[in-house]
Amino acid sequence: GAVYLYNIGNLQCPNAVLQHMSIPQFLGEGTPVVFVRKSESDYGDVVRVMTVVYIKFFVKTTKLCVDQTVWKVNDEQLVVTGGKVGNENDIFKIMKTDLVTPGGSKYVYKLLHCPSHLGCKNIAGNFKNGYPRLVTVDDDKDFIPFVFIKA
């Protein structure tokens, strides 16, 4: 399912990265994201697999929350916003998988969180406090499959 930005806990700025699922209360449209490449030598409209990227929600926001759209992983290993482009701890990569969609598409990917001082960890899904959250996991076989759609 699509990912979206949501406010859990009545914060000033929404910071939860959630996943729509095939469960009626969690169906819906996603929030568009932008992949910001770390290296200026990566140019063009295509983000290649295993390229270092920062992930940023492409959403209208208030002045107060303008810096709260970049993804990061918090101390609970949850994917949230509040990261910074250029911060070595907020790096992600996209990796191709061998999965095929029911429609036959072979363009199925997984996301990895790859802080500079540690190895990469898969992004998987988990319910936390009743919400479908994105989390980092150590198991290479546990991940959410993503299909990217140009917004």
UniProtKB/Swiss-Prot annotation:
Sorted UniProt keywords: Disulfide bond, Protease inhibitor, Thiol protease inhibitor, Vacuole
Chief localisation class: other
Disulfide bonding pattern of the chain: 13-65, 114-120
SMART domains: STI
GO CC annotations, alphabetized: vacuole
GO molecular function, one term: cysteine-type endopeptidase inhibitor activity
InterPro entries per the UniProt record, alphabetical: Kunitz_inhibitor_STI-like_sf (IPR011065), Prot_inh_Kunz-lg (IPR002160)
Cellular compartment(s): Vacuole
Function of the protein: Inhibitor of cysteine proteases. May protect the plant by inhibiting proteases of invading organisms.
Family: Belongs to the protease inhibitor I3 (leguminous Kunitz-type inhibitor) family.
Protein name: Cysteine protease inhibitor 5
Originating organism: Solanum tuberosum (Potato)
Lineage: Eukaryota, Viridiplantae, Streptophyta, Embryophyta, Tracheophyta
